[in-house]
Amino acid sequence: FVVCTQQQSMTKDIYLASPHIGVSSRRTGVLVEDIYLNRKQFSRQIFLRCQHYSTALQILTQQPQAILTIPKNILVHLQLAQDLNIFDVPVELPNIDLGMYWHKDLQLNSRHSFLRSEISKIFA
């Protein structure tokens, strides 16, 4: 994970005190980052929740104090405005292992194989 923001520096105190944009395909519920932060007895303020990282990056350009925590391997595939800075996350977040499942009938399907390959490139 990395942090995107217009802020000029990033510390643990700044990270925890700043307003955050949360990204999730679900409308409600705890975000994966918050599960790990809560385990360390940290919390953050989610002021806005959206479903796409690209939308969150656009919002960051209009919210100078806002912060987005985003997987580094996703960020490299998105457009980043020039006024946004990238920092390492100042709190420890674990790596998250992702897996893919598909029906055995699709194993030899060339289109499905291509799609799996592209997904692996993004999330590897």
Where are these predicted regions, by residue range?
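Structural motif
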Residues: 2-4, 21, 69, 101
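Secondary-structure junction motif
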Residues: 4-6, 10-12, 17-40, 108-110, ...
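A late-sequence structural motif
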Residues: 3, 12, 84-124
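Residue-level preference for short coil/turn positions at secondary-structure junctions
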Residues: 16-17, 64, 94-96
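Hydrophobic hinge/microswitch elements
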Residues: 26-85
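Structured beta->alpha junctions
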Residues: 24-25, 48, 90, 104
